[in-house]
């Protein structure tokens, strides 16, 4: 069975949710502690959301120096699929595995809402279950989700197809070019601010209208992200 590591730092909140999403997708979730200098032979890694090390200095800055991250950086350079969600995205940027930075939301408020995203790049290890142009609805919760990069970096990201997810209908945090997630050149490392792990199990996902016209919890739009990496590993 495919084994997917889920990293826990002090202050991580969503590791159990990420592990549950991995298991629903059909893989075995393997806990990786921040002090681990060994990835225990996992086939992919998820860095989940939360407030690692209390968000001191900058969000993700201390986590980027943890022993487990040295191994993740090394193995990602050899092709290991890595997904960073919310705080995990911040950690990937602080580790220079992905470009840009996540800063305070432009309205200076913490967000918690369902968010529509458009898949811009369906050719990464984490998005192959989708088609470019597909829209998905997943929860969003952050205070520092405002993605920014230099004009030259933004032009490169757009020109080389490295924008993976884009906010639809509304830009919730001021991110440049409505960017919600990006990838590296190889397509094995992806980071996004919204939380696909919270939209993987029927009855517990975002609100949607049912056949009776009433609102129901049940969206599973995020499950394809976890199924994508399994397909990438076996394909």
Regions inferred by a protein language model and the residue ranges of each:
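Pocket-forming structural segment of enzyme catalytic cores
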Residues: 97-180
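Short, acidic Gly/Pro/Ser/Thr-rich loop/turn segments
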Residues: 12-14, 52-54, 124-126, 144-148, ...
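N-terminal beta1-alpha1 cap of cysteine-dependent amidohydrolase-like domains
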Residues: 1-85, 93-99, 103-111, 118, ...
